[in-house]
């Protein structure tokens, strides 16, 4: 590697460029050729290597052949439907269950509008949106884990 000259931060032209936000990286370093020729291929090849490595180390099994006459005791949906499945399973009234299930995307739709006047991107400076996100994540994990358990242990996760 060659010797890299450090920029002179006392240079008024460079200070004006940095004040305007010009440049992609530190000190106004351009994205071409550094990012596009070095960082992006490394990230792409690293991602491909991770996927190939996981496919070799943990191959997915085909499983046993389907038998239409042997129905499992409880049919579970795909993992990303576990929280709403748990809502439908535990709420006694079907209409209330459907309304609660419909409130999930409506609640997600309102999250960007919480504190939208706040210009900060730091989560610690946006307490309402951060709290809603953390509580929503905890509830989704709780419902998702509970959906994999029997119905009598699903709400308490078998802890109580």
From Swiss-Prot:
Alphabetized UniProt keyword annotations: Chloroplast, Electron transport, Membrane, Photosynthesis, Plastid, Thylakoid, Transmembrane, Transmembrane helix, Transport
A cellular component term, taken from the record's GO annotations: chloroplast thylakoid membrane
One MF annotation (Gene Ontology) recorded for this entry: electron transporter, transferring electrons within the cyclic electron transport pathway of photosynthesis activity
UniProt-listed InterPro entries: Cyt_b/b6_C, Cyt_b/b6_C_sf, Cyt_b6/f_cplx_suIV, Cytochrome_b_C_euk/bac
Record carries keyword Ribosomal protein: no
Superkingdom of origin organism: Eukaryota
GO BP term, pick one: photosynthetic electron transport chain
CDD domains: cytochrome_b_C
Transmembrane annotation, as ranges: 36-56, 95-115, 131-151
Subcellular location(s) of the protein: Plastid, Chloroplast thylakoid membrane
Membrane topology type: Multi-pass membrane protein
Family statement: Belongs to the cytochrome b family. PetD subfamily.
Protein function: Component of the cytochrome b6-f complex, which mediates electron transfer between photosystem II (PSII) and photosystem I (PSI), cyclic electron flow around PSI, and state transitions.
Subunit structure: The 4 large subunits of the cytochrome b6-f complex are cytochrome b6, subunit IV (17 kDa polypeptide, petD), cytochrome f and the Rieske protein, while the 4 small subunits are petG, petL, petM and petN. The complex functions as a dimer.
UniProt protein name: Cytochrome b6-f complex subunit 4
Organism name: Acorus calamus
Upper lineage: Eukaryota, Viridiplantae, Streptophyta, Embryophyta, Tracheophyta
Gene encoding the protein: petD
């Amino acid at each position: 590697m060659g010797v890299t000259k450090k920029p002179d931060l006392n240079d008024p032209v460079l200070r004006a460029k940095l004040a305007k936000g010009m440049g992609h990286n530190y000190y106004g370093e351009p994205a071409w050729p550094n990012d596009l020729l070095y960082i992006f291929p490394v990230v792409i090849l690293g991602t491909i290597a991770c996927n190939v490595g996981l496919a070799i180390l943990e191959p997915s099994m085909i499983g046993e052949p389907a038998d239409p006459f042997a129905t499992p005791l409880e049919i579970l949906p795909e993992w990303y439907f576990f929280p709403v499945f748990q809502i439908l399973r535990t709420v006694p009234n079907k209409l209330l269950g459907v309304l609660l299930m419909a409130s999930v995307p409506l609640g997600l739709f309102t999250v960007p509008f919480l504190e939208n006047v706040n210009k900060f991107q730091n989560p610690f400076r946006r307490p309402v949106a951060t709290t809603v996100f953390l509580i929503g994540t905890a509830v989704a994990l709780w419902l998702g884990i509970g959906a994999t358990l029997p119905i009598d242990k699903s709400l308490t996760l078998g802890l109580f």
